[in-house]
Amino acid sequence: MVIFINRFSKTILLFFGMLVFVFLLGFGITALYFRSTAANLYVQARNSIDSSFNSAKAFANALANSANQFSKSSITNNLDQVKKDLEQSLQKVDEYKKNLESQNNLGNISQEKIRELDATKKDLENSKTQLDNFKNNLDKNGTASSSPSVKKQATADGVISAVSEFSTQAQSIVSSYEKIKNNIPSSEQFNNYYDVTMITIVAVSGGMLAILITTIVFSFLTSKKRGLIRFSRFISTEQLADHVNDILDRYPDLEEEVITALDHD
């Protein structure tokens, strides 16, 4: 019974061992067969990661710039356009004044019209000067007024501070994301790792299967059965006798029965 259990346990272990190596061998061969498909899937995944990183980085950079520019960027663009329109108006006023003066020389235009035109030109020039001062103050202080109220300034400063703080956090997250992304293998590295790993799996599992099968075949061809026990064909008579003596020493009652049976024979 003990011999049967021992042989059965070894058979089960051998069977499951071979099953595991057969699975690994099949997995490795299948993976090598679909190597190009795996490479394409990895490239798509890597491109998706790169795209999402670039989007996140662009957002973080835009956010960082907006912390200093959001309070004046849109105003500055509009002021430039207004200033351009004022300069065009002044140019037209000068042209109109020259035309009036030429008409005045002919006695067709009164001095009152020219004075009204001069007043209009002066108003435009004052507006242009105020606009320049307004824009310069905006570029210098980042606010639309040289003397903003305390409440409005505190609100603006609070918004800028909040945006700056969030921008710092976003930059930190993007930096950590970039470190992780840089540690992800490139497509070339992935192909190398993939090939080496799968070839190793195939070689090791195939080699172990070959060893197990060779061992089983060799054991079967070089063994002989004596009763319930199978011995190697290369075992000597002395080794067999020693083995029997070990069994008899372990079971004294059995030894007496064997000796009695031999005596009767």
Swiss-Prot record:
Location(s), subcellular: Cell membrane
Ranges in a coiled coil: 72-141
Topology in membrane: Multi-pass membrane protein
Transmembrane region(s): 12-32, 201-221
GO cellular component labels: plasma membrane
InterPro entries hit by this protein: MG279/MG280
Key word Cell membrane present: yes
Keyword terms: Cell membrane, Coiled coil, Membrane, Transmembrane, Transmembrane helix
Knockout consequences: Not essential, it can be deleted.
Transmembrane helix is among the record's keywords: yes
Region (Disordered): 131-151
Full protein name: Uncharacterized protein MG280
Organism: Mycoplasma genitalium (strain ATCC 33530 / DSM 19775 / NCTC 10195 / G37)
